[in-house]
Regions:
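Secretory targeting signatures
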Residues: 1-30, 91, 178
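A diffuse structural propensity rather than consistent per-protein peaks
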Residues: 2, 75-81, 141-145
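Short, glycine-/Ser/Thr-/acidic-enriched flexible segments
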Residues: 15, 43-44, 168
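Short boundary motifs at domain starts and secondary-structure transition points
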Residues: 25-31, 151-154, 287
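A domain-level signal for caspase-like cysteine endopeptidase catalytic cores
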Residues: 27-125
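Extracytoplasmic/periplasmic, Sec-exported soluble proteins
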Residues: 46-54, 83, 140-144, 153, ...
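Cysteine protease catalytic core and zymogen-processing segment of caspase-like enzymes
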Residues: 100-186
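Active-site-proximal C-terminal subdomain of hydrolase catalytic domains
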Residues: 159-287
């Protein structure tokens, strides 16, 4: 084999080693970025404020711990959106919800008259979608149930799900669906809630999580909607000692470490390349 081919082989070997180490260094839950999302359609109830203050205050709390925040509002809250939330670490569902039969369903902002375009989810013995109505306005919307989340949602990666709507944790079916898809904890209400009550309690929850660094069980303690008597609770029980702030720290540290690794690679490669070039010149001079 000629010396030129040997040198070329060495370069290829270096590239392979760098690529292999790069893959090894990627975080195991690399599909998740330190991002949060607020899915927001409480304003479907006309007397309910869109509560710009809630979104601004929640975003500020999350930004201060290094998280980017996306906000999907009213008409952006579709059936398909519920399928595509797996990339978020913190998922705040500021949406209407309620019981259909024995299960909690989450409202979309799509009028029930549009149900035809989701025919693939309809049929006998299919409980993927429901007809959910707001009693004060009489308007009805498409809602997604636990089986929809379980069968069609993206996988989550230890995500924290905060369901702000009514009866979101009256039974555990919806929570179980999110956990089955990879969420670490589901937080929701045991009864009906008011917009003001859920906004205030959720902001307090976020402060306890990301400013006071409390565990799930301590963060939800005594958080109630005084107007209805609803309590904020969590599922599963084994998540009681989870600290959501720690999840963010792990992702940020992993992302920073990986960035430093990538930055250093050109230096390592250039040094190796320089040494090989010297070897090539020495070999060349022998002829």
């Amino acid at each position: 084999m000629s010396r030129k081919l040997i040198i070329l082989a060495l370069f290829i070997l270096i590239v392979i080693i760098v690529a292999a180490v790069t893959v090894f260094m990627l975080p195991q839950n690399g599909s998740v970025q330190p991002k949060a999302v607020i899915v927001d359609n409480l304003a479907l109830m006309r007397e309910a404020s869109s509560n710009k203050d809630f979104v601004e205050n929640a975003t500020k709390i999350l930004n201060e711990v290094g998280m980017e925040v996306d906000h999907f509002y009213l008409e952006e809250v579709t059936v398909n959106l519920y399928k595509n939330l797996g990339s978020y670490l913190i998922v705040i569902l500021r949406v209407h919800s309620g019981m259909l039969g024995d299960d909690t369903y989450l409202f979309t902002s799509e009028n029930i008259q549009k149900i035809g375009k989701y025919s693939q989810y309809l049929g006998k013995n299919k409980n993927y979608l429901g007809n959910a109505c707001i009693s004060t306005t009489g308007e009805c919307f498409i809602a997604v149930g636990p089986s929809f989340i379980r069968d069609f949602s993206e996988n989550f990666h230890d995500s924290v799900i905060i369901a702000m709507g009514c009866e979101s944790l009256k039974t555990t079916a919806l929570a179980e669906a999110f956990i089955a898809k990879g969420a670490s904890v589901f937080i929701g209400w045991t009864r009906e809630v008011t917009p003001e009550g859920t906004d205030n309690a959720t902001l307090q929850l976020l402060r306890r999580f990301f400013i006071e660094n409390k565990t799930v069980s301590k963060a939800v303690k005594d958080l109630v909607d005084k107007s209805t008597g609803a309590k904020l609770d969590f599922y599963p029980d084994k998540a009681e000692n989870l600290k959501p702030f720690s999840l963010i720290e792990k992702l940020i540290v992993a992302k920073a470490s990986f960035s430093i690794f990538l930055i250093n690679q050109p230096l390592i490669f250039n040094e190796s390349q320089f040494e090989i070039n010297l070897s090539y010149r020495r070999l060349f001079r022998k002829f």
